[in-house]
Amino acid sequence: MIKRELYMSRIRPFIGTELIKVMTGIRRCGKSVMLELIKQELTESGVSPTQFISINFEDMSYSHLQTAQALHDEITKRAKEIGGKVYLFFDEIQEVKDWEKCINSFRVSLDCDIYITGSNAKLLSGELATYLGGRYVEFVIYPFSFGEFMELYRSISPDASIQQCFQKYLLAGGMPYLANLRYADAPSKQYLHDLFNSVQLKDIVKRNKIRDVDLLERIIAYVIANVGTTFSATSLAKFLKNEQRTVAPETILNYIKYCCEAYLFYQVKREDLQGKQILASNEKYYIADHGIREAVFGGNMRDINLILENIVYLELLRRGYEVTVGRTGDKEIDFVCDKRGEKLYVQVTYLLASEETVNREFGAYDSIRDNFPKYVVSLDEFDMSRNGIKHRNIRDFLLAEEWN
């Protein structure tokens, strides 16, 4: 079991506190493993596993606990039987109706330490925020980074070079379970296709009571095909009209929002760096795992420039950056990144193969006058840094402990 220290280092300070620890992220990204890692640390610190109460609400053996009252009664009974402090681990808690009511009740009435996971970004919105009144901390879990992937892939193929690992990562992506399939092509593709269908059905269609599933599938296919490119709901509506589907832009925006809430896509807003304001239209979207894109849509190598962008974007999120697309006049910076006031700029391209490409990628920074780090990231092996702008091979960039 890979340690996932990036997340554990953030969660560790809250272990044992009264704050509810909430882990969210796309289905099968490794949230359950995080619960096991936390149990492992608790056990190593002297807590007996007999104090743990663990429930995965996708397990049919717990189908009788699908309401807040049933769950409350069961946990209260088991906590009394155990005695002393109990550690509650609830996986995919959104399957329980009104679950936030009993979670708050446990926090108030039991001597307990609570950990929950869920596959929807709205988990902490609305009623839960009201019930818990800020007494929780959230951690978004992502599929494997390139570094995590390489660690596991080399446990299967010890002689694989960094280049070979990255080539595999471009197609397979970072979903943890693929290691159990030894990253074999056909089984991996089947697994990712089934995972995509599960996210679409359980976390989007069922949760949002969508009736026009065909329309949803068309919208998802369009966004997947156009990861990393700016488009508007109006342009997508025109595209659908050409397919004899008349759809209001508002409906399209709602469907994409549902996909983002299920962590299938991430929306990146555009920022006018001169006017210092967020622009209202033509956002970009990236997919939670580029391996899913290859399995469902194909073409990762054909669209490698966009896939490299997708990989870098997810790495920026993993490391805690807030990310926008920057616009300066008629030029665009792929990623403007901010973490507690510390900025970072990143341009991503496939290869700096011509003087025109070099001028475009490095020239995007011409009007940026601050002294924050500026990167151009590509698959080129040779360092082409210039004018204070750092050039990095994408593998080195992804594996670097820090960027400065």
Q: What are these language model-derived features?
A:
Residues 183-343:
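Accessory nucleic acid-recognition modules appended to NTPase machines
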Residues 54-84:
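Short glycine-rich substrate-engagement loop in P-loop NTPases that contacts/grips substrate
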Residues 23:
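Hydrophobic anchor at the beta1->P-loop junction of P-loop NTPases
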Residues 2-16:
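Pre-Walker A adenine-sensing motif
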Residues 31:
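Conserved lysine of the Walker
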Residues 121, 126-230, 263:
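Interdomain motor-coupling "hinge/lid" segment immediately C-terminal to the ATP-binding subdomain
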Residues 34, 38:
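Hydrophobic positions on the alpha1 helix immediately C-terminal to the Walker A/P-loop
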Residues 326, 350-395:
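Catalytic cores of nucleic-acid endonucleases
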